[in-house]
Amino acid sequence: MKKTGSFAEFHVNMIERVMVRPCLPSPKTILPLSAIDNMARAFSNVLLVYAANMDRVSADPAKVIREALSKVLVYYYPFAGRLRNKENGELEVECTGQGVLFLEAMADSDLSVLTDLDNYNPSFQQLIFSLPQDTDIEDLHLLIVQVTRFTCGGFVVGANVYGSACDAKGFGQFLQSMAEMARGEVKPSIEPIWNRELVKLEHCMPFRMSHLQIIHAPVIEEKFVQTSLVINFEIINHIRRRIMEERKESLSSFEIVAALVWLAKIKAFQIPHSENVKLLFAMDLRRSFNPPLPHGYYGNAFGIACAMDNVHDLLSGSLLRTIMIIKKSKFSLHKELNSKTVMSSSVVDVNTKFEDVVSISDWRHSIYYEVDFGWGDAMNVSTMLQQQEHEKSLPTYFSFLQSTKNMPDGIKMLMFMPPSKLKKFKIEIEAMIKKYVTKVCPSKL
């Protein structure tokens, strides 16, 4: 390991790269994808960090997880298949049993080099394997798993999954099942249910997550960076009490922090007052379908809520007003579900600029934190937003995560934005907090 600028550079040596197939014969069939599955045409990733366990010194995590993957694919055999295009342009899964790409690697450092994965380090890219951007969709691996061991005995599981196969909740279910296999269970505790025909949304718009170029995007010369900020629950609860003095309203921690993020981003980017801006966030709709989707359904079952308002009106209004706009967007999404659409036209307005859009994902209640391969629960869970060299513009993105043990108890915001805006964003969000409390949350900006 060596220090390069502000980064602790480390090297990962690839030991083996293999295809892992189901350990028992699996059905060879064609499976349909739902309308929502067809919209989610992009990879997403998760990083699970595990500390060394003195009770398992002789165990090889890569071997254990590789064998568990082979076992769990008996139940989740579609992951071992490949996508193919139908004549109408929709996708389906051909269950070929070709397998999941699995990589074993070894880092030349201990886990301390990761620093909770809060601030972007180019070396982190070695922890997740990504296919080339120009890979044909029918050649894509639906799932890629990499296990990287560190010199201290700890390890990182980096998984890259294609969105059409499952959503975050469904993938958490898969990882939990794989962990159960690693701990010696003979079958998953939750029976996986494919049944994509249960999601019948005839009026879904043909919008794909990877096609954000439909939004007008000015060229940004800066490479986006990833860093984090923690807002502790003491501050959130104080803000909640102060706001409720104005109006007796039930306010969630997500709504409060999302409102702070939205307003701070607008100010930091100095968006003109005449512009309309949007806050986008996904919501799990499994229990909102009529009838509700069955327990174990791991396909995409989310909708994109869209909070939208004029910059002048947002900045001249109160924090409560912004929160109520966010609450209204939640209600509107459920209303749209009843009318058989999960994405309104306002979400994909072609006149919206990237700089006017904020996207938030909330992982705080994800099952990712409980995935135990036999070394205990993950000590840290994170994601890595990967900007390709040719991408000159992206929406500002936030992931809400649980704070790690060395941080205050609160919401950890993983942020992805141009570096020139980070300092201003911190100033703005702290200024808003100071209106309600005198103690400002610790940050790592």
Curated annotation (Swiss-Prot):
Tell whether Transferase is among the UniProt keywords: yes
Matches recorded under InterPro entries = CAT-like_dom_sf, Plant_acyltransferase
Lineage runs: Eukaryota, Viridiplantae, Streptophyta, Embryophyta, Tracheophyta
Q: Does the keyword Magnesium apply?
A: no
Q: What are the protein's UniProt keywords?
A: Acyltransferase, Taxol biosynthesis, Transferase
Q: Which GO annotations describe the biological process of this protein?
A: paclitaxel biosynthetic process
User: What does the similarity note say?
Assistant: Belongs to the plant acyltransferase family.
Say what the protein does. Answer: Acyltransferase involved in taxol biosynthesis. Catalyzes the selective 13-O-acylation of baccatin III with (3R)-3-amino-3-phenylpropanoyl-CoA as the acyl donor to form 3'-N-debenzoyl-2'-deoxytaxol.
What Pfam families does the database record attribute to this sequence? Transferase
E.C. numbers: 2.3.1.320
Pathway info = Alkaloid biosynthesis; taxol biosynthesis
Superkingdom, according to UniProt? Eukaryota
Q: What is this protein called?
A: Baccatin III:3-amino-3-phenylpropanoyltransferase
Q: Which GO terms describe its molecular function?
A: phenylpropanoyltransferase activity
* pH dependence of activity: Optimum pH is 6.8.
Report the enzyme's class at the first EC level.
transferase
User: What reaction does this enzyme carry out catalytically?
Assistant: (3R)-3-amino-3-phenylpropanoyl-CoA + baccatin III = 3'-N-debenzoyl-2'-deoxytaxol + CoA
